[in-house]
Amino acid sequence: MLYFENDYCEGAHPAILQKLTETNFEKVSGYGTDPYCASAREKIRAACACPEADVQFISGGTQSNAIVIASMLQRWQGVVAAATGHVAGHEAGAIEYTGHKVITLPQHNGKLDAAELRELVATFYADDNHDHMVFPGMVYISHPTEYGTLYTKAELEEIGRAHV
């Protein structure tokens, strides 16, 4: 059985262990200033076609999610996620700690449904008091989901259109 709980539940791929063994005794500076991080930065910049991008490495997924969500949302906005989405439960309040609410929708094998998202947004804006409520400012997608399911391109496109 495959489990998609988090990346801490499994060991490393044999190729990664081999590379770690090969480089174990190399003396390099730490904290992202080593040649391996420099190489990774260049590969990320090239893949994103952003040669001037400031690429930073974060220690884990929770920290990454919290930083990205906090930096992209206004203080009155929240993030919409499936009830089983990682930010809705497994991150132990890290998102809420930044001052942003996680707005949950029902999950369907771990996925969000675009029609339900569309309804949430429509209901929010139809409420005359919505200026006093948490705005749905972002949609969080787990891919694969906590159930191991994958969104199709069409599902992602529909979710993107539902939130506009």
Predicted segments, located by residue:
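PLP-dependent aminotransferase-class I/II
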Residues: 99-146, 150-155
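Conserved core of the PLP fold type I
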Residues: 52-73, 103-110
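Conserved PLP-anchoring active-site segment centered on the Schiff-base-forming lysine
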Residues: 71-89, 118
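Solvent-exposed alpha-helices and their adjacent loops that cap or buttress functional pockets
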Residues: 47-50, 72, 94-97, 129-134
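Conserved N-terminal alpha-helix of the aminotransferase class I/II PLP-enzyme fold
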Residues: 13-61, 83-88, 94
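N-terminal amphipathic/basic leader segments beginning at the initiator methionine
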Residues: 1-19
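Conserved small/polar residues in nucleotide/adenosyl-binding loops
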Residues: 162-164
